[in-house]
Amino acid sequence: MAEVSAKSVTVEEMAEEDDAAIEERWSLYEAYNELHALAQELETPFEAPAVLVVGQQTDGKSALVEALMGFQFNHVGGGTKTRRPITLHMKYDPQCQFPLCHLGSDDDPSVSLPKSLSQIQAYIEAENMRLEQEPCSPFSAKEIIVKVQYKYCPNLTIIDTPGLIAPAPGLKNRALQVQARAVEALVRAKMQHKEFIILCLEDSSDWSIATTRRIVMQVDPELSRTIVVSTKLDTKIPQFSCSSDVEVFLSPPASALDSSLLGDSPFFTSVPSGRVGYGQDSVYKSNDEFKQAVSLREMEDIASLEKKLGRLLTKQEKSRIGISKLRLFLEELLWKRYKESVPLIIPLLGKEYRSTVRKLDTVSKELSSLDEAKLKERGRTFHDLFLTKLSLLLKGTVVAPPDKFGETLQDERTQGGAFVGTDGLQFSHKLIPNAGMRLYGGAQYHRAMAEFRFLVGAIKCPPITREEIVNACGVEDIHDGTNYSRTACVIAVAKARETFEPFLHQLGARLLHILKRLLPISVYLLQKEGEYLSGHEVFLKRVASAFNSFVESTEKSCRDKCMEDLASTTRYVTWSLHNKNRAGLRQFLDSFGGTEHNTTSGNAIGFSLPQDALGGTTDTKSRSDVKLSHLASNIDSGSSIQTTEMRLADLLDSTLWNRKLAPSSERIVYALVQQIFQGIREYFLASAELKFNCFLLMPIVDKLPALLREELENAFEDDLDSIFDITNLRQSLDQKKRSTEIELRRIKRIKEKFRVMNEKLNSHEFAQNLKAPSVQH
């Protein structure tokens, strides 16, 4: 009797130990389920291990999920109806005769409401219809979370994603092509989570066709965390004509399927057709019958394969065939990942807990500072810090990331406008130093000025036509002769104003764009240092409006000053200013005078203009005069006087009395226009750069602080509640404080669960009890 009693005690103890192990496993599953919900809500960096199901619409994805669950969920149907991922937290409960389901709240994922299968199905269908009506975002990455307890459920977390679409090419299928890209982007984003095990479904008897693997391998190239599943095995077996085809299908070569995939080789599954219900179209009366049909289908598949092969399947081959084998493998794998991840998740939860504590402290401090004196002081402090950041950006800094805030010259031209001449052409941006670098602040301002100098300094005088010269001659108020010096001035100033005025407006727009960019960069620097007035949008908008208005008005004022300079230098020609390169003009006219010939009476006679007509001194002889003097030395004085008079008459005839434009007159006008245009260009370039530096850049440094301070004090004199929106802000902060406190308690509770679980996993006694789930579902 004593022996029997001892044996009874031993059996009872073993049963208690098994129950304890199962209970601890369930506790760990629950902790991970809570962690997964928390990660979805807060978008935290940690994720719980889960199985992500990926497949085409026609791969039997929904049927496979139902077979793994042990009951028909019927949440999709035909076509593209799953538009949000569905997370199924499944828990094995032998006492649960019917599926017990809870639906996670979209507003608070920590809250799960008990729902029937029909209610959950109705909710999912309503969500799908809602998203289908939104053309801009027909799919959503936010998961629908469902918790299920059932006697046939495995202990798994499965995320069922929308089915991938393979649309036909052509314009008429454009809408479906857009949907296909949206689904693929959603699925690819889900696969990025390194903790997820990817269940890749393929419906093909040829492993060289990688419909779903093509997308999966973009994220997991080696398939190291991917389980490949060949679905609809029962329909493929009859397609094989010989045993060798079956051998290749069951054991694909490395050239067709990478051997590094998770599980070493693919799984093969079949799910019997037919729905559970009491209608005429129903095949199964209950989920128990459906479960039995799944098991029977598995045995039939093995028998059919053995018949095709002409041999019995090995133990290794059988371990890859059927829903039950796939479910057991997933459970063991997920359980292993759960245990391995516990020590890694604890520090992440600790970090998130400390971050939430700091967030709560910040909210509490903001609530305590909502009085007039403190708000005014914070506003003045923000003013000083904002100006400090502006000055820092102009002087140069590397604190703001160039990849986020910098602009290349091409970007700058696109956003702020390009320098374009009257011909509509642009210089290549590659000719400008640092064109490919992403700059901001003072460095970007300097590059824009350098581009302006480079482009304007290289501008040549536009072509001059004979018609323009003749039209510019006109008629004087006292005589009808021609004045080619006036003609040259009229043409030069008109060409200069037409050429340079657009560049002035373009320079103003470009520099205005660069200076306005200082505002968001300064805000970023303040946020980075924790000095940003978060929640005070009305006040911040007022500061931003004052800054932008100041920059815009200052740029306009500066541009008006530059326009006055351009108007003055193109209204009246001052020879000492405009004719900068008189030596070049003399050289041009000297060569002209030495080569110009008059063939009248067979005598070769050259002529030159007096020096004072060219703006030079009268005591300096030109080379043409020297040549003429040398020519006249062999002629008697009477002949010399006669020749000089003839030359003077010819000169007056060609430049004063004759309206027929001679080549000599045309060349003189062209030379004068070139010199005047060059003088205007040099003056315009120096004046514009100097004025933009003095009257646009410098006011940012020395006038903006006083203006912002005045704007700030005026704002304080107004209704302070309207400026800082104290009432709404207090309500918002109170709500934020309550939600942060709830979040903190949730993190603390989950953190404590994982801490206790980690201690038990590390204990020798618990390690002996915790084995892979051995419950037969």
From Swiss-Prot:
The gene is ARC5. Residues 300-320, 728-765 form a coiled coil. This is Dynamin-like protein ARC5. Residues 55-62 are annotated as: G1 motif. It comes from Arabidopsis thaliana (Mouse-ear cress). It comes from the Eukaryota. Disulfide bonds: none annotated. Induction: Induced by gibberellic acid (GA). Residues 265-268 are annotated as: G5 motif.
